């Protein structure tokens, strides 16, 4: 299993819009083959930081999602919401 931890920093005046976009993306992810689960974490120290942890069955399945037209639609306009580029890292899930 693969865990993908991604930090997003929304522009201060776009936090609500950014959360809605990420929630919409999560809904789209949940319909994709190989999706397992998704959690959204909100930073206690930085109100603009939204982190997601998404679990997929395999690295290849996640790569397929990243290249999908469904993801492109779900994340359309996202770049205008971030104060800096998102940072993502892939992890093996411990059993």
Give the ranges of each region predicted by the language model.
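Short, surface-exposed ligand-recognition loops at beta-strand->loop->(often short) alpha-helix junctions
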Residues: 9-21
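An amphipathic, aromatic/His-enriched active-site/gating alpha helix that lines ligand/cofactor pockets
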Residues: 24-36, 55-89
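Absolute protein N-terminus
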Residues: 1-2, 95
């Amino acid at each position: 299993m693969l865990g993908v931890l991604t930090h997003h920093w929304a522009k201060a005046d776009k936090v609500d819009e950014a959360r809605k976009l990420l929630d919409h993306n999560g809904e789209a992810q949940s319909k994709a083959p190989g999706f397992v689960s998704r959690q959204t974490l909100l930073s206690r120290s930085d109100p603009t930081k939204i982190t997601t942890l998404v679990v997929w069955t395999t690295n290849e399945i996640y790569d397929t999602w990243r290249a999908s037209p469904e993801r492109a639609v779900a994340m359309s306009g996202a770049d205008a919401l971030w104060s800096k580029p998102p940072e993502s890292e892939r992890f093996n899930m411990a059993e």
